[in-house]
């Protein structure tokens, strides 16, 4: 087997092992589901996003909020995954072994990220289904949604590498990642954001993704 075949096997192995491990310990998925739905419930109760009806001339503004929320979940998953993976490897003393491995580090961590995306997709589907029943949101899936979400995820993964480096340097991984995830919720038009802030955050992948997703929806 050639080198490319070996790298693919290692990539697939990382995906499979992390996915099965996460499924086996379901508490993390269940807690994520509860937190995501609870936070979305807050936005629905406070009627966040009603300004989108005028901005996009679209009556079903709750769908636009849900779209932004889905994009945000993928974005924070990218950041938390790479930061968490690096922190875990450092804690267990295995990072330097992976750095010196014959396989590129991006393949090893990339497999973990793909597994994370698959798990988050399951969680997102459940959140969307529950939201449709509880809040009566008319949500329609468009295949075109996949392109901006994919590009956003890759962009946010790159940002996640930078964030992880900073967080590990200051030894405050959890705190820094949490603050950035929270900030992204309110400065990227995931929920209505002022034009002044959007002028600054316009080029963040999540902000662009939210804009494109809503344009597709309407």
Which residues make up each language-model segment?
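Hydrophobic alpha-helical transmembrane segments of multi-pass membrane transport proteins
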Residues: 62-132
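Aromatic- and glycine-rich beta-strand/loop motifs that create alpha-glucan
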Residues: 1-34
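Membrane-interface helix-capping segments at transmembrane helix termini in multi-pass transporters
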Residues: 48-67, 130-145, 217
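Structural signal for membrane-spanning alpha-helices in multi-pass inner-membrane proteins
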Residues: 39, 43-47, 72, 76, ...
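Alpha-helical transmembrane segments and their short interhelical loops
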Residues: 105, 110-175
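Transmembrane helix-boundary elements of multi-pass transport/secretion proteins
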Residues: 21-89
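Hydrophobic alpha-helical transmembrane bundles that constitute the permease/transmembrane domains
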Residues: 26-29, 33-37, 78, 113, ...
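Transmembrane helix segments
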Residues: 168-203, 207, 211
């Amino acid at each position: 087997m050639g080198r490319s075949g070996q790298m693919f096997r290692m990539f697939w192995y990382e995906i499979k092992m992390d996915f099965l491990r996460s499924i086996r310990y379901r508490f993390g998925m269940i807690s994520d589901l509860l937190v995501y739905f609870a936070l979305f419930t807050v936005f629905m109760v406070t009627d966040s996003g009603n300004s989108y009806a005028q901005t996009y001339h679209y009556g079903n503004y709750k769908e636009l909020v849900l779209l932004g929320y889905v994009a945000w979940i993928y974005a924070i998953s990218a950041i938390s995954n790479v930061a968490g993976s690096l922190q875990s490897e450092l804690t267990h003393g295995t990072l330097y072994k992976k750095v010196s491995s014959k396989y590129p580090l991006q393949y090893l961590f990339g497999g973990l990220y793909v597994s994370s995306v698959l798990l988050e997709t399951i969680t997102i589907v459940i959140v969307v289904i529950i939201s449709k029943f509880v809040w009566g949101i008319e949500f329609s899936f468009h295949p075109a949604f996949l392109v901006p979400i994919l590009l956003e995820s890759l962009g946010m993964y790159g940002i996640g590498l930078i964030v992880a480096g900073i967080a590990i340097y200051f030894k405050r991984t959890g705190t820094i990642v949490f603050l950035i995830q929270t900030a992204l919720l309110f400065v990227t038009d995931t929920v209505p954001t002022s034009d002044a802030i959007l002028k600054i955050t316009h080029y963040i992948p999540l902000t662009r993704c939210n804009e494109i997703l809503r344009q597709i929806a309407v």
